[in-house]
Amino acid sequence: MGDAIDLSGDGGVLKKIVRSAKPDAISPSDDLPVVDVHYEGILAEDEKVFDTTREDNLVFSFELGTGSVIRSWDIALKTMKVGEVAKITCKPEYAYGRAGSPPDIPPDATLIFEVELVACRPRKGASVGSVSEERARLEDLKKQREIAAAAKEDDKKKREEAKAAAAARIQAKLDAKKGPGKGKGKGKAK
């Protein structure tokens, strides 16, 4: 899609966007450090695939900045958006270095990863936003529920009062119709 971007400043981590994300897509952040990715890892020297999540269609999840993945991934994933697919070229010092990762990755290997950022989310048990913001939101919801309950109770009371008033009016009309001299044998003069 474009030229490779030098993310490390020394040519050690190059990123080339294969598919752009939607403009409003989210990116990993301090609030959303856990990422889910699909990837395919290739040895640059012989283009042999050494690892992929595509075969079993399971995403690989990890938290950025914890050292749980190679340095190039921490650097590159922070620049991606959900839905983006990028080709990341990693020099050995940003991958597995002199040690490699036997048996699949030899020492001093340059690696190429095609990575799709599938999702980013908060740490388990954490929420986006601060605890005080969450408390304030819950307090506001509680107040809204109390106001709604009071309004409902008020409406119920008004309906009961209206029913009682209507019953009193009907009773008054019935009593008026039964006035003196209109009933059977009551007070009729002969």
Curated annotation (Swiss-Prot):
Q: In which domain of life is the source organism classified?
A: Eukaryota
Question: What residues bear N-acetylglycine in this entry?
Answer: G2
Compositionally biased, Basic and acidic residues: which spans? 149-163
Which PROSITE patterns does the UniProt record give? FKBP_PPIASE
Which EC numbers does the record give? 5.2.1.8
Q: Which GO terms describe its cellular component?
A: cytosol
Q: PANTHER family from the entry? A: PEPTIDYL-PROLYL CIS-TRANS ISOMERASE, PEPTIDYL-PROLYL CIS-TRANS ISOMERASE FKBP20-1
**Name recorded for this polypeptide:** Peptidyl-prolyl cis-trans isomerase FKBP20-1
